[in-house]
């Protein structure tokens, strides 16, 4: 969970179901002290990385150094995914395609980020690593992110 300003408080509990997974709340130095107290009161582990916003690069370094984590899996929304790929912090992109079409102007995208603007914001290239056909005609696509 990435929340640099301490806004998300409803219905959140620490992940205790699976000892193989570890959920960490990520926040920034400007998060209100009462928010950090809220996280502690619910035994929700957190890391502070960044001043006004969560510094994703610093966060990944801290997770590796403090928790010895080598692999992070995120099923985040488009904003976090977009920020990670635009910051060159993703190694792989895994996409699960389901055989349904959901349309609409408000439908979320896989990657929400600033519009392309040459030369500062360029498209991210992907190289196909693997495909698998799953049950119910679903397809799993696994890509390596190629940074030039």
Regions found by a protein language model. Name each.
Residues 1-148:
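Enzymes that bind and transform nitrogen-containing heteroaromatic metabolites
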């Amino acid at each position: 969970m990435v929340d640099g300003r301490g806004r998300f408080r409803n219905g959140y509990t620490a992940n205790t179901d699976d000892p193989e997974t570890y959920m960490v709340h990520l926040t920034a130095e400007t998060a209100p002290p009462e928010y950090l107290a809220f996280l502690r009161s619910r035994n929700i582990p957190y890391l502070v990385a960044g001043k006004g916003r969560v510094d994703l690069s610093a966060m990944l370094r801290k997770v590796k150094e403090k928790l010895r984590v080598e692999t992070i899996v995120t099923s985040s929304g488009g904003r976090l995914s977009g920020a990670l790929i635009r910051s060159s912090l993703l190694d792989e992109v895994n996409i699960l395609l389901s055989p349904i079409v959901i349309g609409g102007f408000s439908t979320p995208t896989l990657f929400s980020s600033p519009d392309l603007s040459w030369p500062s914001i360029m498209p991210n290239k992907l190289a196909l690593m693997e495909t698998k056909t799953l049950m119910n005609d679903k397809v799993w696509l696994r890509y390596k992110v190629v940074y030039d």
